[in-house]
Amino acid sequence: MSSTSSNPDDGDTTEQSQLGLDTVIKKLEDTILSPMARREDRALTVRGEGQRASPTPVPARIREIVSSSLGEEPLSGLREPPATTSHAREESELLQEELTRLEDLLAQADAEREELASRCHMVSQRLQARLDTTEARLRKSELEHSMDLEEALSRLEASQQRSMGLSQVNTLLRQQLEHMQKANDTLARELTRATHSLVHLQRKLELQESQRLSLRQPRDILPLWRQAKALQTHLAELRASTERGLTDVQADMTRTAQRLHMACLNLDSHLRLTASSMTSDLEQRLREQAREMLQLQGQWAAEKVALQARLSEQTLLVEKLSVQKEQGERAILTLKSDIQRLKSRRSGGQLAVDELRDEVESLHHVLASIKEVAQSDAMCPELAWSSSIEVREAQARLRSPPRSVSPHQRMSPARTSSPTSLHPALQAVQAAIERRQQREQELRLRLESSQEEAAGLREQLSGYRQELRTSQRLLQDRAQEHEDLLGQLEAQRQEAQLSQASVHLLEREKEALETTMEELRAKADIREAETQKLEVTNAELRRSLLLRAEQKAELAQQSERSLRELEASQGRVEQLEEKVSGLRKELATSREALSSMQLQRDILETEKESLHGALAQAESGNADLELLVTRLKAEGMEQQDSLAKMAALLEGLSQDKGTLNHLALQLEQERDQLREQQKMLQQEQAGMREQLTQTGQQLGLIRAERRSLKETCGHLEQKQDHLEKQVVLLGQENAQLREQVGQVTNKKQALEKQLAQSLQDQEAQMDILQEALHEKNTLSEERAQLLAKQEALERHSELVTKEAADLRAERNSLENSLFEAQRLTTQLQTQQEQLEGKAEAAQLARRALQVEIERLKSDWEVRETKLQLHLGQLQQQAAQQEQEAQLALERQELAHTEDLARLHREKDTLSLSLAEEKEAAARWMEQQKELLTRSAADREALQGEIQNLKQERDESLLQLEHEMQQALSLKDAEKSLLSKELSGAHRELERARQEAQNQQVQAEATVTTMTKELRTLQVQFEEAISTHQREADTLREKLREIAAERSSVRREAEELQAQLNVAHERLAELRQELQASEESREGLQREALGARRALEDEVQEKDVLQHSNTELRASIHRAEQEKASLKRSKEEQEQKLLLLQEAQVAAQKEAYELRTRLQELERAQRDTRRKLQERHRQVRTLEAENQRKRQEVSDLQAQVSRDAQHRQKNLQESLELQRQVAEAQAAHDGVQKEVLGLRQKLAEVEASGETRAKQLEGHLCESQRAEQTLQAELCRITRKLQEASNQADSLQRSLDNACSRVHVLEQELAKAEGARCNAEAQLGRLWSTLCSGLGQSRNLLASPKRPHSPTTGSSQTRPGRQRTSPPTRSYSPARWPSPVPVDPKSEVIDVAFVRDALRDLVQGLLEAQQERDNSGIQVANLSSQLSEAERERLRLQSRVEQLQRDLADAEEGQRRAESALQSAQAARALQKEALQRLETEHLASARAAGQERRRLQEQVDTLRQALEESSRPSQSLADKGRLLEQPLQQVLPHSRRDRAERRALREQTTSLRTERARLQGELAALRTRLIQTEQETLKKEEDRAMLGAKKELLLQSLSHLHQEVDGALRQSQQLQVASLKKRLDKEVWQRQQQAHSD
């Protein structure tokens, strides 16, 4: 019954088991062959039974195993139990094979993970590279933008300088226009004078006619008529000549206006072209920069998209993990359904039911715990700990005894699990869940790191956006600067427009002058018509002369008028003499202009010397500026074109000037013709007198015409006043132009100051110097043109002197004409009886004139005394100024000594208080600035006083000349009156012809004797001149010898300069080598930074791993002990480092204090030297001005003495000439004595300068030795740097090897973990299927068997990383004994084998993790060693930089020595004209040099001490590096012991990084100090250039003094000859008058 009843139950159970197996198999196939499964899971194969069986897929093999186990009948199971054992063995073998396959699959998954990690690394590297490239592009764009802006600024400066040159050309053109206006004014004056002379002649004619009519002498009318006719012809010729001159002037004015217009148009076009080109260039550059910015934005957008893609990939990975988690949950549900089915199947047998119930309950509990763990895992990963607690509760429930169902169960107490037993499936599930939690935790950490990276990238993006904003702001600023530049260009255009407006004003003035000339022409035409009317009236008068004899009285009045006109002609002669005086004034003004031009030339030469010095400075940096020179060549070509245009303009102006000179010569020729016409007029006066007898009837008309002429003269005077007002306006415009020129000069000075500042700031602005050199070339060309103009002015002055001589000759000819008139008066001697009374009256007048002459002499003597008093006052003032200058110098010397003492005291007190010293230095600098301002104000005041004195002297000279001219004019008037009286006397004394002839013979004899005496005097004078010239030649030869000596000294200086240049070149080579070493060092730094970044990335990853392995490290107490010991050693090392750092900081502070002291002392010395030099310059200028004043006073005294001598007789004149020759010889002797004294002083100064030069050369040798020692130390330190770099490279290689090993270990670990997880999953699935199948087979047995320990639920344990749970406790294997002896050992052996394999696998994983940790520790150790090596390299680098500083200090000392040598040479050149007080200053400078030498020695000692102190910490660090290399060798075999050292070494690396940052700050400070020293050297070179300029100024002043002495001698000779000629002429004339009177 039982059997029959059991059959259908068995069928049902078989059917149910078959369905359950099908569902399990289907589930396994879905998990393995589903589309969500991986490729490796689908391709899993297992070998069949036997070794030669072909590999079959895992699901097929599982079906075979299950179907074979289920297809057997239960009886066969009872009959053949060994088959089941063999079948279990085969299944165990299959499981082992599956485990190997799963391990392979895990390895492949790890490889894929590694590929993903490598891809992430590659992406990060690409992002970093893109960031670097973008940064480089931004820097490059900023550099290019700054270069473009600098070029734009240089172009603007060039345009400003061009505008300055054009403004100078405009000033020259305006000056020439002023000269032309002056010439026009002189012509107008001559016209007015001619009209006045006409009126005067008419009056004279009227007077003569009235006199002759009163004397009833109609014969005089004929000569008067002739004179009137000649006057008319003369007027016509004068009119024609004036018209010709005016037409020529008009043509010249039109030409100049056209040229000016063309020049202005060219200037405007050039300025527009330059402005447009500059604006277009700037716009193009801005567009390019905007494009680059857009490109950068696009790149950043692409990088942002890549980062977003990376984030999306990470999110997809998270979603995949969540899907896998859901699949695990589904697998758990399917397992629950399978278990329920198994429960329904196993209700067939009682024993089996009891056992199955127990097993089902246990499995149910296990599944419940697994479900709770999975649900907690699915709900929240943070509930992992609670799930583990529930699992433990489940384990406790498993360990509790099950409920009893039957008495059989009570009889078998062995069914209850032992308290130490735990289900292996639960263990596997817990381990899988823990691993999954670990994985999830790792993924979360990676997500957090990726988010942090994304945040960092966002921050970088924000930083780059800020940089973009700053760059945009910079672009806006640059655009603003561009607008400012455009505004400046518009201002320049406005200036050009103003110049054009001034040109238009000049053209309008020219047109006004042309209108006035046309008006004058119209008036001249009116006068011609009036003269024609007069001729007609004269013809009518001739006809009516016979009928109108009654009007003789009116004719007499007419003769009086003619006499008045004669007097007017004499007045015209006086006016001509006044014109001569005006020409003399112009000559004086031209001389003043020449002197001003010479001063300008001197200034230009000084500027040239200063620019030469700047060029000498710039030559050292030309290697860096060759690229800029190539860019500036195009601009130079444009400037050359503009210069060529300007040269063409200047040539045109010179041609215009030549035409003006030609016009002036033509006017002079016309003036000569006018004078000849005047002679003709005087000859034709007789004819005019005859004609005037016939003009008696038309006297009323003539008077009316005279009134009209007077009105016209008034109009002309008004026009002249108008022209004078215009001249005043032009003078005001000239003053405005001068003010503009002053502003331009101020701008030029400001630009020069800016140039000096730019030289001090950076060598990057040397292109401005090159442009200044181009401008210097233009200035030299302008100077050549100015010299040509000066020569032309000199020629003009010579022409003026020639004209003066011609005027004198014309005056003599006029006197001859007067004599001829006197001869004509001999025909009228018939009237002698009537004119005896007149002769007596003439004698009375003569006596009165003699009285007046005596009065004039007394007035002249009074003026001479006044002048002498004035000269004495001037001399006293000069002496007072000299005394004040000497007192000021003495005060400055005292102040200098006091300042030196105070500086010494401050040097002693510097160690106590640095702040007080800085405040004192600031106060001292302010005082020095105030002193400089005061000295500048005093100098300006002195210059103003000197200019006032010069103006007063010039005004006094002009007044004297004017007074002399007035006296001469008075004398000429008296002469004319006397000639009139003599003519009357000759008319009255016709009887005394014979006596007059005898007197004439006597006069001729006296003339011959006087001429002989004059010839002898001339011979003597020529001999004196020849002797003077010989002496001058000897002096010139001596001066040439002195110049030769100077040239030799210059050659020596040039040789020294060449040596210095060689030294500079060597220094430049050394600097280049240092720069190359710095570049290599920077490359190493970049490589170290890259390695450091990679290390930091790896350290971050390893930190994550360490965080996951903290629980394993907690069990290692030995590592903690080692960590404590390492901490102690680290603290000791940190204390040592702190002590070393404090010592280094103290040494650096001391060195810095010493350097600041030395720098302040050097600044004080430079300021004092500059002050002394300025004072010396002021003294020299005052002495030169005093000498000039003395020369001028001596010239004035000589002129006064000459005037006094002219009043004496010829014999006294000869004696005075001899006395003057003796005085000249005495002066010559005095000059020779002074020259000898100066030579002695020069010899003394040269000897002292040579001694000082020797001292400075010794100083230079010492500095060169120090430099050689420093170079040797530098070479040694460079070797150490190379060794350190080699060590760093070796460490880097070992670090790379360790990193690669770490990567390999990580890959292996990941593979092992993946393989373990897959194997556990597969084992769980297989074990569940086997347990279900074997349970069904055991259900048919009589006695229960011990079930295997299944590991169900592995399907839900997909690999997912989460937080680590506490370590699971190891339990003993669950052994369930059964009463049936069915060889349980085989099954136990199989389960133990699986457990052992799992344990081995876990042990392997633990060992792999330990190896990974050890490799991380090794990497950390290697990174710390590499950081230490880098620190060592940085310290060596700091040592190199310190040596560079020492070398720079040595170079600075050498430069100081060079500057001192150059200052000695300049002092040698300057002291050639100085006085004895310069010797004391020289001694002071020698003392200062000795002090400098001591200071340099002290500085060298301090630097050596600093070097020794800095070498000590470097040696200690080297020892430390050696000590650290030993543990580096010991790290590899003892890797497991050094885990705790990693943290300590990290802390040490952080401290070393802070120290590195501090050292970098010190390096930046040292670089700033290097820049400051270079600026100081540049300042010294500028001072040297200034001294050279002063030297050349002194040489030029010597040459100017010689020229002025020669010119004064020539002027004295010319004045003596002229005075002798005048006196001889006066004596001859007086004798002739006496003869005529007798």
UniProtKB/Swiss-Prot annotation:
Short name of any one Pfam family annotated for the protein: Rootletin
InterPro entries for this protein: Rootletin-like_CC (IPR055167)
Residue ranges, compositional bias (Basic and acidic residues): 1180-1193
Protein name: Ciliary rootlet coiled-coil protein 2
Organism: Mus musculus
Ranges of compositional bias, category Low complexity: 67-82
Gene from which this protein is expressed: Crocc2
Coiled-coil residue spans: 85-144, 426-1234, 1281-1315, 1412-1506, 1542-1576
UniProt region (Disordered), positions on chain: 1-21, 39-92, 396-423, 1168-1213, 1338-1383, 1506-1551
Cysteines joined through disulfide linkages: none
Keywords: Coiled coil
Sequence ranges of Polar residues compositional bias: 1-20, 406-421, 1349-1371
Family statement drawn from the similarity comment of this UniProt entry: Belongs to the rootletin family.
Highest rank taxon of the organism: Eukaryota
Phylogenetic lineage: Eukaryota, Metazoa, Chordata, Craniata, Vertebrata
